[in-house]
Amino acid sequence: MIKKSMVMAAGFGTRMRPLTLQIPKPLVQVLGKPLIDYSLDFLADAGVEEAVVNSHYLAELLEAHLSVRTSKPKIIISRENAVLETGGGIKNALKLFDDAPFFVVNSDVICINGKTPALHRLWQAWDDAEMDALLLLHKVEDAVGYEGRGDFFVGDDGVLRRRTQQETAPLVFTGVQIIHPRLFTDSPDGAFSLNVLYNKNLARVGAVVHDGAWLHVGDQTGLTQAENWLKTNKNSQL
């Protein structure tokens, strides 16, 4: 089982304004609990021992919150002088990881486990010889707080295909994944999206469809929907 992870937490959270004018988005509370604590607890519940958290916007506030957190996982900060986006942020932190796969979790989602913890399912499906990344996907029709047109199709052979600009896809990327550092071979410097690397290496990107719930807390509408879902499903495994 993978013991190391990264939590993406450096962005400006512009879609969550005005809440994020005073605090970084990872500290926005969902039923009284900061978003990032849902992500960290999700990792800890799966046995992950260490989480690298990238920070930039209102970094001091985020880091102060993390510094007084006493529960697992152990936190290591990767401060960014400029926002590096998803790809650049992870590449900037690779020095903190071994040459081995690690989990990555976005800090603006709440992932509710199904019968088997989602991270365990990802690890069971990981094929180091065939994969550089393994994405946890979710059915668009079952997503909470997500209003987009999906990201991927998965064929009967398990092969991923991105939707075209005109299409609507049945599966959305949850922001939860396994990445191997070799995905970043010959990658750009500075700020860039992970989508650049997915598109370049799609044949080595796998997928698992999540069997639990997924709450996308991208804006205030998503926040309200997430809180309503959690109130209605109090016995769900967080």
Where are these regions (language model features)?
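Glycine-rich N-terminal loop/short-helix segment of MobA-like nucleotidyltransferase
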Residues: 1-30, 44-46
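Conserved N-terminal catalytic core of the sugar/cofactor nucleotidyltransferase
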Residues: 1-7, 33-106, 110, 186-189
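Hydrophobic packing residues within well-ordered alpha-helices of enzyme cores
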Residues: 16, 62-66, 226
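Short beta-strand-to-loop element that shapes/binds the nucleotide-sugar donor at the catalytic cleft/hinge
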Residues: 57, 133-151
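A short helix-to-beta-strand connector/capping loop
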Residues: 71-75, 156, 203
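Catalytic-core segments of class I nucleotidyltransferases/pyrophosphorylases
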Residues: 102-103, 110, 114-127, 141-144, ...
